């Protein structure tokens, strides 16, 4: 599908993953979180969050970084079930993730292959596109750099916990979008394709 522009009236889910490392082929998802945005409004009551039980133990440095321990995931859903639940939450929404082209979407694709889950195509945007559109080649398009530029507070949300990161990212996306299109009618950011599990139910 050729990239095209999209507007904020669309049903959007901003999401984030936490994992045991940076390699989709070698590491595992341990947390998925998402929050819905419609018409430029963050719909906090429509949110999703789950820990995910990996096959291997969570390394200590990942626990130190994310706050997620082996105790958190001990009774969590298996990856296939967690991804199917996330797919049900997403529905027909367009997905947005930060650095998602290089991180989140490859992890989802790899996990669908690993767990033999058939996939469906959804609209997808890497929120770094908003940052690059606003600030061009300036150094730093990470979420912390964007928070500093937008003077955003974390409002007590824990960074590197997917539940906290999606709340912060939703606020950042909303502010960047508003700067690009004050009435949220149009956004000069291309919409690409992502995948999530096909859910027959």
Give the location of each predicted region.
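Short secondary-structure transition/capping segments
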Residues: 83-85, 167-171
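Active-site phosphate/pyrophosphate-handling residues
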Residues: 106, 129, 167
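Short acidic/polar capping segments at secondary-structure boundaries
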Residues: 101-102, 130, 153, 174-176
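Acidic two-metal-ion nuclease catalytic site recognized across multiple nuclease folds
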Residues: 2-4, 149, 170-201
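A short, structured active-site edge motif that brings together acidic residues
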Residues: 121-132
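Acidic donor-binding loop at a coil-to-helix junction in glycosyltransferase catalytic cores
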Residues: 164
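Conserved non-catalytic scaffold segment of RNase H-like nuclease domains
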Residues: 2-122, 136-160
